Every structure is written in structure tokens, then in C-alpha cells.
From Swiss-Prot:
Signal peptide: none
Chain coiled-coil ranges: none
Molecular function terms from GO: oxidoreductase activity
Similarity-based family: Belongs to the oxygen-dependent FAD-linked oxidoreductase family.
Protein name, entry field: Allergen Api g 5
PTM text: Carries MUXF and MMXF, two complex N-linked glycans with alpha-1,3-fucose and beta-1,2-xylose residues in their structures. MMXF is added to Asn-62.
UniProt keywords, alphabetically: Allergen, FAD, Flavoprotein, Glycoprotein, Oxidoreductase
Cofactor(s) needed by this chain: FAD
Glycosylation sites: 62
Length: 86
């Protein structure tokens, strides 16, 4: 299964090109069979809560490749197991 720390690296690179606020990993839902995962991240600007961001990523070995941003988990319906809390 993907290492949750890999998502931090992935989100960090994504946020630099999309958002200026810091991105904090909240949860990971991974599908090891399809080698895909959905990340849920909270963006903060100082102490102010900014937004919830979802991104679908593809795992390639120990690295991640961003596929697309999704508005919510409802936009990517599937049976994701297991559920990781970070």
C-alpha cells in the first residue's frame, strides 16, 4: 500500500502550482488494486481554515503522479479500502 508520507510530497508539489496556502494532509483513501487513491487535504492560511481539497492520484512505485482535482468524494465513487487517517 502507498506510504502516507508520499502524499505529503505529492500535495506539496501540487499546492505550489495551485494554492499559496499550506496544504495539510487529513486523510487518504487508497485502492491498492487500481493503484489509485483519493486524498483529502485541508488548506490553511495562517490560522484561518481555507478549504477542503480532493485530488485523485496514481501511484507509480513509491512516487505519486497527480491525475486530477475532484470536487468531492462523490465525484469519484468506488469502494476504497482501507481508509487511512493521518
Amino acid at each position: 500500500l502507498p506510504n502516507p508520507s508520499g502524499f505529503v510530497t505529492c500535495l506539496s508539489s501540487i499546492s505550489k502550482s495551485v494554492y499559496t496556502p499550506a496544504i495539510n494532509l487529513k486523510a487518504v483513501i487508497a485502492d491498492p488494486v487500481a493503484k489509485t487513491a483519493v486524498v483529502q487535504a485541508g488548506a490553511t492560511l495562517g490560522e484561518v481554515y481555507y478549504x477542503i481539497i480532493y485530488a485523485r492520484v496514481l501511484w507509480v512505485g513509491n512516487t505519486t503522479q497527480k491525475l486530477e482535482w475532484i470536487r468531492s468524494l462523490h465525484d469519484y465513487q468506488s469502494s476504497f479500502f482501507p481508509f487511512f487517517s493521518a
